[in-house]
Amino acid sequence: MKGKRDNIAEYILYLWQMEDYLRAFPKNADATPELHDLNEMMHREGILDGGHLALAQNALSELEDLHSELLNEDAMYRAAILRLQPSLNLLKAKTDRPTMSDIEACLTLLYQIMLLRLQKKEISPETASVQTQATQVLTFLSKTYHDNQTAV
């Protein structure tokens, strides 16, 4: 697994995947030390039935903060978000959390597409196009986050 500094978006998606895995297969919680530790954290944080680990939430907050900075400082980034905005608004409207952030919506989109692919379900060309745009935004954010972290 890549670490948070290497690719923060992949890190968040990985944590979400491990949370779902541990919920689906609780008997495998001790299969590796990493799974055991994540399961213990989920237990302590009271999210065995739903929700996300503080690790994931904190990483998401960092990504959202960077997103806010870039909206004010980077015209190309702002343009990419504006192109993606109608799709994000539609996605948010279809969820039980219509007020989620744009970055959480991008991550949720990619996570849901991953789940559909695991189920061997077809992805529409429109969804694939939005996936490409969301991936580009998250890639840029992750690279900028990485550059900021390694410059310290």
Task: List the model feature ranges, each with a label.
Residues 92-152:
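Glycine-rich, aromatic-bearing surface loops/beta-hairpins
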